[in-house]
Regions:
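RNase H-like nuclease fold core
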Residues: 79-82, 90-95, 129-133, 142-231, ...
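Basic, short loop/linker segments at the boundary and entry of helix-turn-helix/winged-helix-like folds
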Residues: 59-112, 128-141, 208
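Acidic/histidine-rich catalytic cores and adjacent linkers
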Residues: 246, 279-401
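DNA-recognition alpha helix
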Residues: 117-128
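Subset of Sec-pathway N-terminal targeting signals
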Residues: 1-15, 23-61, 65-71
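Metal-dependent DNA phosphodiester-chemistry modules and their immediately adjacent helices/loops
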Residues: 87, 261-289, 295
Length: 401
């Protein structure tokens, strides 16, 4: 009686007795191990029968390795030949995971923010399979070609609205020090009214110069026009946008402006100042807003001149939204939409204090995005009405029919 038959009978006995067949102490792992090694021996026999006729190639020992399967860990003894021409198919060279379902599960757990330690513990507990951090990393690296293809895909020629903002993380540099990295994100609304992440870009810091590179990349990938760009108050950002998309309307985030203003107002005045400021950004039109800004300055200008000056200096960019309908104003007066996306991403990345590499950061953020975008199947509420308003406003730049 050979070992394969013994393992088969053991599996059958455990099945009848109700014992576990899978994972730790299960009978299927050793049975699978026998089957795989027998198949490899058969492959080598077939390979040598062809080689020996021409070159006299012979066996040259075996190479042992551990392979993870959904039934547990198995030891594979891969035969070797003297000429090194044997290429096994049953278990390929350098293959350490023999179950696409297992690899997919690892990637899915990683995409949900599960730590490598918890992933390893789960597979050890459920399948008696030992996964090192390097193994998990190599499995999740399978998504890297997908990221490359996604980052270079062609885009639509026109987007109705785009929000541009950065999210920051800590990453180890080449010397092992934790440094800040910014991921620049461009979240857009296409002509169908659906959210779309046009791109994400890793850089050492947020700045207008790098945003210029980002916008140029969008142009190179087919974007010809963005009707409205919504941004924070980064200096030089509007100029960077209009150097690439000169017809775009640029709206500075009102919420950012308010936050920055309040920082320089004394705590005992903040409540009253905010109430007065609300009459400016909450006005019915731009003329009314300008009149209320004059009133704000007459009351608070001597006490907080720098705050008032900031509103004056950025006035045209801060008040772009007044030329649109209330429904469109609600979408563009703040970068809340992209910040909401960032909050969803952080729910996944919050378990990572410092990322070991830029690649590991980009990999996890992309996987988080891949799950988030599954919900972006429907257009914005009342998009039919909004798209008509945009078509009337922008004419030939936004044809919907």
């Amino acid at each position: 009686m050979d070992n394969l038959e013994i393992d088969y009978k053991k599996a059958a006995q455990q099945l009848r007795s109700g014992e576990a067949l899978f994972g730790k102490d299960g009978a299927l792992a050793p049975l699978l191990e026998r089957i795989l090694n027998s198949a490899l021996e058969g492959e080598m026999d077939a390979h040598l029968s062809e080689e020996e006729r021409s070159s006299g190639n012979r066996r040259n020992g075996k190479m042992s390795k551990k392979v993870q399967t959904k039934y547990g860990e198995v030891t594979i003894e891969t035969p070797r030949d003297r000429d090194g021409t044997f290429q096994p198919e049953t278990v390929k060279k350098r293959e350490t995971i023999l179950a696409n379902g297992m690899a997919d599960q690892i990637i899915e757990m990683y995409a949900m923010g599960t730590s490598t330690r918890d992933i390893s513990s789960y597979f050890e507990r459920e399948f008696n399979t030992t996964l090192s951090a390097d193994t998990i990393s190599s499995i999740t690296d399978r998504v890297l070609p997908e990221i490359t293809a996604w980052k270079s895909r062609m885009l639509d020629p026109v987007y109705a609205i785009c929000w541009l903002d950065a999210i920051h993380y800590k990453v180890k540099d080449e010397n092992g020090r934790a440094v800040t990295r910014a991921i620049y994100n461009i979240l857009g609304i296409n002509k169908e009214g659906q959210k779309e992440l046009l791109g994400m870009y890793v850089s050492k810091s947020e700045g207008a110069n790098f945003w210029l590179e980002v916008l140029t990349d969008l142009q190179n990938r087919g974007v010809r026009d963005i009707l409205i760009c919504c941004i924070d108050g980064l200096k030089g950002f509007p100029d960077a946008i209009q150097s690439v998309f000169p017809e775009s309307s640029v709206q500075l985030c009102i919420v950012h402006q308010i936050r920055n203003s309040i920082k320089y107002v004394g705590s005992k005045h903040q409540k009253e100042f905010i109430k007065d400021l609300r009459t400016v950004y909450g006005a019915v039109n731009k003329d009314s807003a300008a009149a209320n800004l004059d009133l704000l300055e007459s009351k608070w200008g001597e006490m907080y001149p720098i705050v008032i000056k900031s509103w004056r200096d950025n006035w045209e960019r801060l008040t772009e939204y007044f030329q649109y309908t209330p429904a469109i104003r609600k979408l563009i007066y703040t970068t809340y939409t992209v910040e909401g996306y960032h909050r969803q991403v952080r729910k996944v990345t919050k378990t990572k204090g410092v990322f070991p590499t830029d690649n590991s950061l980009e990999k996890l953020v992309y996987l988080a995005y891949r799950n988030i975008r599954k919900k972006w199947t429907m257009p914005l509420a009342n998009w039919g009405q909004l798209s008509q308003q945009l078509a009337i406003k922008f004419g030939d730049r936004f044809k919907i029919m």
